[in-house]
Amino acid sequence: MCRVDLCLRPAPGPLVLVEVLPAGSLLSQLLAQGAEEAWVTPGPKVARLLAEELGKEALLLGEVEGFPLEGFHGRLSLVELEGLNLKGKRAILVAPTLNASLLPGEEEVYLVGFRNAKAAWELLRPLKGLVLRPAGAPEPLLSAMVAAGFLQKKLAPHAPLSLASALLRAFPDPQEALFQSPEGQALHKEGRTEELARASLIGVDPVVPRLAGVRFFPKWEYGLTQDRYAQRFVPWNG
């Protein structure tokens, strides 16, 4: 049995964090293409601090209004990074919504979107007490809500009707759901509709990212406005 929780509160069991856009799909693609790990950071300053620690294998990815951040290797783009050999790379993503969707102390966490849905439901089905949390909770992203409904339908087809499953009925086509979402519209306005097509593909990434660690950045030590965290994800094979 699994349930969708729209609140940002500690999960009592294994947590499935669901995000499609803007960063979740890219993270699973990076690991599927051989990246050793993928870090999720709240902003460019923490990302740059982390890159200094990780060294030459760091791959900095982030953007503002569709343009790469200064000194970064690229944008959060499925299209631009597809097919690259990332073996040994240590990706660092600036993804504030995804970063803020996890609470300190949560340990058993899996990241799922449409692209790795098939691998996810095969690996997650044996686990008990799954909680699905759409990214952005307690104000979840529309695309994440629809993906959570899709995943719940596969993992627990007889679960009671939820808002996520109701949205899935309203948007049975994943690509249409992404296009109608605010996060999808932002990409559309930048002329990046191909990103929506790639993010809506189901089951093309054979990996499920699992949380493998959290790096703490105290504000007093690094000159930040508040304490920050960066989460490290690695491929999980069950």
Residues covered by each model-derived region:
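Short acidic, Gly/Ser-rich segments with clustered Asp/Glu that frequently serve as metal-coordination loops
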Residues: P10-Q29
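A metal-dependent hydrolase metal-coordination microenvironment
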Residues: R48-L49, L59-E82
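A short alpha/beta connector and helix-capping loop motif
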Residues: G24-K45, L54-G55, V64
